[in-house]
């Protein structure tokens, strides 16, 4: 590994995404080639037991792009996928994003650099802070998201507002310490990780993003 570069895993948890996965991976590869030149990056598709053509599509792409990797899990759960892949990683930074790339990728380097430069241990995209832009989300879903934010902040006395945006970066050191204490294997994984991080004095930093439903 070239010591002049910071190694980075970009994990994409998926389940039956044959309709969108090829275009999303191609877009992410193109972006990373152009804008992540200071990182030794690889994309890891964490497949939670897809029964469609997702595996075949990713395997085809992995033969085309050396930085695209396929990881199969038979059990479902986004949290399980992330924890398994992050645990097996030896990269300096680890991240994940939703396969639909609903968060504008131009914000990704800002999150990466903030963790790389040690201004925080976990950087997260947020749809609920000032300057964020959310396009196409229904009023009902927006209301539910804000209610959930109010609920966990009130219950756990944490400062971050958006735990569920699929756009996060974590340092190797923080992951090694925190992951053994994270038990949820599904959608609550993100919230649990961030709560435990703040309670153990790891800095979580939110960044406004452009998010399209």
Describe every region a protein language model picked out.
Residues 1-30:
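N-proximal low-complexity "stem/linker" segments adjacent to membrane-targeting elements
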Residues 7-9, 42, 192:
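Cell-envelope/extracellular polymer assembly enzymes that use nucleotide-activated donors
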Residues 19-23, 52-61:
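Acidic helix N-cap motif at the loop->helix transition within catalytic regions
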Residues 41-44, 55-88:
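Conserved donor nucleotide-binding strand/loop of the catalytic core
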Residues 47-55, 101:
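A conserved acidic beta->alpha catalytic loop
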Residues 73-88, 93, 105-187, 213:
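Acceptor/aglycone-binding surface of glycosyltransferases and processive sugar-polymer synthases
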Residues 158-159, 183-185, 194-212:
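Catalytic donor-sugar/metal-binding loop of nucleotide-sugar-dependent glycosyltransferases
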